[in-house]
Structures are given as structure tokens and as C-alpha cells.
Amino acid sequence: MKKTKFFLLGLAALAMTACNKDNEAEPIVETDATVSFIIKAGSPQRETEPNSLLDSDAKITKLTAMVYAGQVQEGIKTVEDADNVLKVEGIKCKSGANKVLVVVANYDKNAGGDAIDFTGKTLDQVKAMTIQLTQDNQSAKFLIMTGESNAFTIKPGTNYYGYPAGTGTTQDNLIETGNALKVTRVHAAMSIQNVTVTFDPQYSSNYYFKPQNVAGLICKKQSKIFGASLDFGTDYLGGVATTAAAYTPTSYDNSVSWLTKPYAAKAGFYIMESVYQVGNNLRPTILCVYGKLKKTETQDFSQEELDAAVAAGYCDGNAITYYPVLVNYNGYGYTYTGENTGLNKILRNNHYKISLTVKGPGTNTPEGPLPEEANLNVNCEVVSWNVVNQSAIWN
């Protein structure tokens, strides 16, 4: 009977724990204070088009906050809310100077990370964590965000970080009044806003192209989640296998089905921060529009015409032609509007929006350097997200 009673009590305790979405681990130091904070991450917005990436993919459903004194984690609390987490309240911690608040949002195994318990981790251990680019984090639900405060002082009692003036009582400690802690996305985004096909006269009577698919090529596989630069490793992913060329990485999985999709305006992908440095085997990220090159809208090439197009480098043996855009690359035919543009790198929290004008046949080696005069114009912009509008013309 006693065993049954204890078993039922245990079940009741488990049920109560399962319903509690504010999970606070026991601090590893004696506590005499609590910290509450609010965050600033932009307005949540849902995708309304199946292929589109929106500028305001900022919804937070899970937020872990940690208080550090040097390397020691003095407090930790996780809050989950399907409708959006904007604050964490009552983190138990110890008073003192030079405290740092570190937050990680939307971090779990579905977001490309491990199912990690942050409890007891040193500051260096948290900052050393990495994530992978996965199919799951092509959903805005799993866009990881991170933030870190400057050093501040916690006083005994109740502390509020980033709250407006007048919060709490006169005995409470207001820190960074009105300046909510900023969190930013670890991912970047790239999308094709539109493709305009207007073949020049020397091509228009012999070639026809209509966009069919969009693919991400040479996309970084891993990323740090903290640091001035998040670029990590030399492993890459791609959505379609093409003939290897100068930019093709040594460590490359180019058969990733979710990095290709049917062409539509605003189609794109969430990607990782990356840097282009040839000497260090670091390659440029490419957003590629491709499809069948034909003689006319209703007529395929004859075998002789196909052979000639392949020999010219316009398409592969299946008549597929590619229009690659090196994202945020400082190259011929690329123009930009906005900030952080033409840097030969992909930066976190930037959305690279590409407009493409096609004036002639593409290439059969999209992972190779573009000719000095290619049939491509690219235009790009930057806001926050930060949006980079890039325009390219393929001549």
C-alpha cells in the first residue's frame, strides 16, 4: 500500500513538473538577488508564402538566460512560450559587480544543435558551442538567436535589466533602463526576389530560358553561435550536383535535397555565416537559378544544337543551364544598395535579397569563376534582418 501511495505521489510530481514551462535550475552559488530582463528581437511574423523568407522571422519560443561572474555560472532559467518569449523573470543569482547576462533562443536539436543542458556550463563552454545547417532550421521556428550584455552590477534584492523607468519599487535596482537586451539571429538568409529574362538579340533567336529551380550551393555546414565572427570549419552543403570547378570545396555534400526548390519570387534559404578566402579553402556561397535551356519556348535543341551549346559552356548534357550569384561578393556586374555589401562574406542576421536580369545563356559550371563579362546582373540591399539588395546581370 505504501509503495502504491509513493508511486502515485511521484506521478503527481512529474505531472506538475511537465506543466511548468519556466524551468530554473538550482544555482551553484548562494543567492541573495534575482534578475529579470526583457529582450528586443523585432516583431514576430508568420510566413504567408510557401517559398518566401520574411524580414521579421523573430519569434522566440524558447529562451535560456544565464548569469555569469567570470567563468562561473551563478544563475540559469529557461522559459518556453509558443506565442513568443519576450522576458525572463526572477533568475536567482548572487549580488556583485562585473556580472554578464548571456541568452540563447530557439536552441535545440531541431535547430541544428545538440539537446544541450546549459546548467553548470562555463562561459567559455557556452561560447564554444556550434550548430549545423539542417532542414529543420529552414523554418523560422528554429532560427537560433543569441545575445550578451556588457558587465553590470547586481544588487541584493530585485534587479530589472532593460525595463522602463518606474518598474518595480524604489528599492529595486534598474539596469540599462529602457534598453532591452538585444538578441540577433545566428543564421543569415538569401533569396531570389525576381528573375527578368530579356535575351540580347544575338541570343534571342537561338535560345530560350524560363527559371525552374533555385538552389543553394557551397553553403557552410556549421557555425559558431557567439563571437565577433561565427564562421566555422571548411565543410559545405549544396542542393544540386554540378561539374566541379575552382570554387568547389574539398569537403562538400552537394546532394542535399532541401537546398533546392522550385523557382518562385522570394524563394530562398536560411544559411550560415561564411568567409571567402581561397588560400584557406574557404569558398563563396552561391544562390543559383537554373532550368532547361531551349531553342524556343516550345522547341528543345536538336542533338547538334545541344552539342554546340555544351561545347560553348552554356549548358550540360541535359540542356540544364545555371545562373549562379556569388552572394555578397564584390565582382563584375554586381551592384548593391544598403549596408554590409560586397564584402566577400556572409554575415549573421543579414538577408541577402537578389534580383537577377538574364540577357543570355548561363553556364554549365556554376561553381567556377564568372567571366569578366557574364550574362548576369545582380542587385542587393541590407536592413535588419539587415537586408542586402543585390542585383546581377547575366549578359
Curated annotation (Swiss-Prot):
<dbReference type="InterPro" id="IPR029141">
    <property type="entry name" value="FimA_N"/>
</dbReference>
<dbReference type="GO" id="GO:0007155">
    <property type="term" value="P:cell adhesion"/>
</dbReference>
<feature type="signal peptide">
    <location>
        <begin position="1"/>
        <end position="18"/>
    </location>
</feature>
<keyword id="KW-0732">Signal</keyword>
<comment type="subunit">
    <text>Fimbriae are composed of a major, structural subunit (FimA) and the minor components FimC, FimD and FimE. Head-to-tail oligomerization of FimA molecules mediates assembly of the fimbrium stalk, while the minor components probably form the fimbrium tip. Linear, head-to-tail oligomerization of FimA is mediated by a conformation change, facilitating the insertion of a C-terminal beta-strand into a groove in the N-terminal domain of the following subunit.</text>
</comment>
<feature type="lipid moiety-binding region" description="S-diacylglycerol cysteine">
    <location>
        <position position="19"/>
    </location>
</feature>
<keyword id="KW-0564">Palmitate</keyword>
<comment type="function">
    <text>Structural subunit of the major fimbriae. These long, filamentous pili are attached to the cell surface; they mediate biofilm formation, adhesion onto host cells and onto other bacteria that are part of the oral microbiome. They play an important role in the invasion of periodontal tissues. Fimbriae and their constituents are major virulence factors. FimA proteins from different strains have highly divergent sequences, and this has been used for classification. The sequence-based classification correlates with pathogenicity.</text>
</comment>
<dbReference type="Pfam" id="PF06321">
    <property type="entry name" value="P_gingi_FimA"/>
</dbReference>
<dbReference type="GO" id="GO:0009289">
    <property type="term" value="C:pilus"/>
</dbReference>
<feature type="propeptide">
    <location>
        <begin position="19"/>
        <end position="40"/>
    </location>
</feature>
<dbReference type="GO" id="GO:0005198">
    <property type="term" value="F:structural molecule activity"/>
</dbReference>
<dbReference type="InterPro" id="IPR053878">
    <property type="entry name" value="FimA_C"/>
</dbReference>
<dbReference type="InterPro" id="IPR008110">
    <property type="entry name" value="Fimbrillin"/>
</dbReference>
<keyword id="KW-0998">Cell outer membrane</keyword>
<keyword id="KW-0843">Virulence</keyword>
<comment type="similarity">
    <text>Belongs to the bacteroidetes fimbrillin superfamily. FimA/Mfa1 family.</text>
</comment>
<keyword id="KW-0130">Cell adhesion</keyword>
<dbReference type="Pfam" id="PF22492">
    <property type="entry name" value="FimA4_C"/>
</dbReference>
<feature type="region of interest" description="Important for oligomerization and fimbrium assembly">
    <location>
        <begin position="385"/>
        <end position="394"/>
    </location>
</feature>
<keyword id="KW-0472">Membrane</keyword>
<keyword id="KW-0449">Lipoprotein</keyword>
<feature type="lipid moiety-binding region" description="N-palmitoyl cysteine">
    <location>
        <position position="19"/>
    </location>
</feature>
<keyword id="KW-0281">Fimbrium</keyword>
<dbReference type="GO" id="GO:0009279">
    <property type="term" value="C:cell outer membrane"/>
</dbReference>
<protein>
    <recommendedName>
        <fullName>Major fimbrium subunit FimA type-5</fullName>
    </recommendedName>
</protein>
